[in-house]
Each structure stands twice: as structure tokens, then as C-alpha cells.
Amino acid sequence: ATMGYEYVLIDNWWNTNIGYERMGQLIKYAQSKKVDMFLWYSSSGYWNDIEQGPTNLMDNPIARKREMKWLQSLGVKGIKVDFFGGDKQETMRLYEDILSDADDHGLMVIFHGCTIPRGWERMYPNYVGSEAVLASENMVFGQHFCDEEAFNACLHPFIRNAVGCMEFGGCFLN
């Protein structure tokens, strides 16, 4: 709040590190500071064997709608869905199913680890953006990524944003 952020993202493993029970308290605290929340989810599916959770919620229509109803009840403003399985038809359908269900529950959506934008902002007013870039989070993997960070951060707005809105998770490491 002190830094003027309107939204913050609670990233992967919040379901185990914070837990569902305590998430309501955290969201109320953030709202008292006039900061709204996005929560991270895995896209899951049989193609996705990642360990980061929560998993097995976004690829199942019943579980997805139940989770989105819970998010709406807490006042969460959006979700960031990560680790999609390519551009096959089934995955493209999943993107639109997530957007449609999220819109029904008043949730904004960011896609991460995903395909390039497909014009979804015209059909889904709750679509915020898609990453589809080599983002700052890669700086933890090696010096090469750190050395390229300034170049990439300047390049993405002019090259990648020509395709459509971009979600870019900038990082600062100390």
C-alpha cells in the first residue's frame, strides 16, 4: 500500500504456505490497505505434472467454478493461470473456458507460461494479458538472463506488445 500498488499477486504454493483458511484474513488485511489480490493457479491437466499448487482446479469445470465462487466470496479481483500445454485445440478451449467462467464470477485473468494473445480482449472484458515473453523471473536461473534483462525489458513493449497486451512480471533481486 505504501508503494501505491493497486493489486498484488500471491504466487504459487499459497495453498500450502498460507492455506485456504488464512487466505481470507490476508485478503481482508490487504483490502483494509486498499490493495486488491490476484491468486496464482496451475492450468493443470494431464500434460502438466508440475508440483507448484494449487493444481487440478482450472482444468476441471466443476472444480474451477467452485474455486471461482470461493474467490468471489473473498473479494479476490483476479487469477493468474500458469503452465499451459502448448497451442493445441484442447488448450485453446481451456483458455476460453477459464475466461468465461472467471467473467461469470467477476474475476480478471492473467495467463502466464502461455500462448501469444488471440484477440481475447475483444470477447472477454476480464482478460488482462498474456505473458508469452522471456520474463524477469528467469534471472534466478543464471547470469546470462541478468545480463539481458535491461535489453529484454526495453524490447518487449515494442516487439511483443505489437501482438497484444502483455503480462510482464518484472523482478528486482538484491
What is each of the regions a protein language model found here?
Residues 1-7:
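An acidic-aromatic substrate-binding cleft motif
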Residues 11-173:
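Aromatic- and carboxylate-enriched substrate-binding clefts and catalytic-loop regions
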